[in-house]
Amino acid sequence: MSKELKLYVHRLYEYDYNTGTIKRKNKICPRCGSFMAFHKWPVPRWHCGKCGHTEFVREAKR
């Protein structure tokens, strides 16, 4: 395996050494099942590059 591939996988998943479980860092798209990307600017949102689904983040009001 190349070094670039190993580094890329570490960006997608997180390993918990205490429990021995692997979990995904980003959300999963409800329409197609692929990873979603988080964008901060101009408005915070989750976007799927595969199908184009977008979820806007709402701030909690105090």
Curated annotation (Swiss-Prot):
GO cellular component, one term: ribosome
Zinc listed as a keyword: yes
InterPro entries given in the database record: Ribosomal_eS31, Ribosomal_eS31_arc, Ribosomal_zn-bd
Ranges annotated as C4-type zinc finger: 29-51
Pfam families noted in UniProt: Ribosomal_S27
Keywords assigned: Metal-binding, Ribonucleoprotein, Ribosomal protein, Zinc, Zinc-finger
Gene Ontology MF, one: zinc ion binding
Gene3D superfamilies the UniProt entry points to: 6.20.50.180
Cofactor entry: Zn(2+)
SS bond partners: none
Residues binding Zn(2+), per UniProt: C29, C32, C48, C51
Cofactor note: Binds 1 zinc ion per subunit.
GO annotation (BP), single: translation
Oligomeric and partner information: Part of the 30S ribosomal subunit.
Family, similarity comment: Belongs to the eukaryotic ribosomal protein eS31 family.
Protein name in the entry: Small ribosomal subunit protein eS31
Highest classification ranks of the organism: Archaea, Thermoproteota, Thermoprotei, Desulfurococcales, Pyrodictiaceae
